[in-house]
């Protein structure tokens, strides 16, 4: 009898204990709620309004699935790699960058292959997919197909005939007391003068160092010929070497009537010049008694997901959201940037864009930007001397040799 009573009491106690545990577990689950997801997004300052709108749409779309805390921070796309690799764990979860930085980011383990690569590849232009791919694996999400440059010009001052040659553009600028501008402090733009001359620069098989023949002293076009052509341009009263920001300021205040830039400035140029806003491929320039078509670097912008993010799955969802068809269309409407998404690229709105049309025309004379890190500073130094009129009087061949040596340094 005592055994039966003890057994009964033990059963009651166990039931109460298990019931209490169940209630406690249920309460904990109810109090947990959606997971808190904090994400930081990096992008260009000009993208602030656009990206905040895109982020807001993302949070609305996934409302209830997580407790989102997503913020946008300004970080220049051209310096993204260096800043991110300076502290991966402290860097943005999602970031915008130029495609030439992908190899270094992947090598450092900052980005990893994308899971749904087939779907992303199917929706985007092949050239942008190629730019986002390493060893047949997609590492980033294509965002734009317009990371190149062309000519903006004011039709009020420059005719369709003059816009074909740099001589014609400079003549029109000087005659009207205005300026044609180009950023010679940037090696990205300076490539224009060398790219279609037969002089070579590029990446060696090691993927790090460069080869360079820009100092070549023989052939139809020598390095000295290009240097002399640049000095003649620099000495023209209708020319000024200006940064992209200075170009835009000049467009707005009326001092600049032509300049080399990209689609990121198309909206601002159109607002400033109105119906007189024109866009065309880069002109030819005079070099060694002939006209040389100015070349350009081309590429695209990509969205990456930090491999060290605390929420990589949500980071990937956000990256895909930023680059989807709807938001690439919005990007074109708000920023005038050319889409990588095939459906948007084929739309009538894109076909009617004079800036995009100019970029496509220039693409025939463009080259994917594939150079190592030691390309930039030597070219900027050389071009800076040319822009200033070679004030030291140093021999041009010596300067070209120094530049080529710096570019190809190991």
Model regions and ranges:
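Hinge/lid segment of periplasmic solute-binding proteins
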Residues: 99-149, 161, 167, 279-282
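Glycine-centered hinge/linker elements that transmit conformational signals in sensory
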Residues: 209-243
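Extracytoplasmic/periplasmic substrate-recognition and gating elements
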Residues: 271-334
